[in-house]
C-alpha cells in the first residue's frame, strides 16, 4: 500500500522486452536507504516488486496486464518516473490509500496557470470517471490529488509548486498520457452496493435508492 506522496524522481536505465512483458531497471537515490529485494515500489503509480538491486538501480518485472492498463506501453529509456516505496505501518500517512493498481490511462487536455498553482484537466474513460467525484481523491502517475471539478468525460486537479518541482507533473503538457487510480474506498462501496442489484427474470433490478433504504442507510 502507498500514500501517493512521491519520494523522488527516478530515471529508467534500461528496458528488457519479453514477448508480452518487460523487465525495467530504474535509477534512484532516496528510496535505496532501506530498499531490499521483494519490496514494493510504485513507479508512476504502478506497484512493482524489486527483483534485483545494485549500484543505485533496481530492476522489476512488469506483467502484460500492467503494460496494457498503463502508460508503460510507451515507456522509454532515460524517461523520468515518480517513485514511492510502500508505506510502513508506523509511518505518516500524508496522502490517501493507494493500491498501486492502475485503473486506466488518461490524457491531459488543458494546463492552466492560476496564481501559484497549475490546473490540469484530464480526459479519462468512463470506466475511470464512474469513480471520480467532486472533492474526492485520485492518483495521477502515483501522486495523490484532490478533484476540484468534473464533467462526464474529464476532471481537473490543482497542483501546488512543490508537487510540480518534486514530481514528473512539472514537465507534463497537453497531450501527456498519465496513469490513473481511483479511490479504492469508492470502488469497494460501488461494488458492494451493486451486489444483488442485477436483474433476473423473476427479480427486477433494484434502484440505488431502494438498496440504500433496504440496508438502513436512508
Identify the meaning behind each predicted range.
Residues 1-218:
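Conserved loop->alpha-helix
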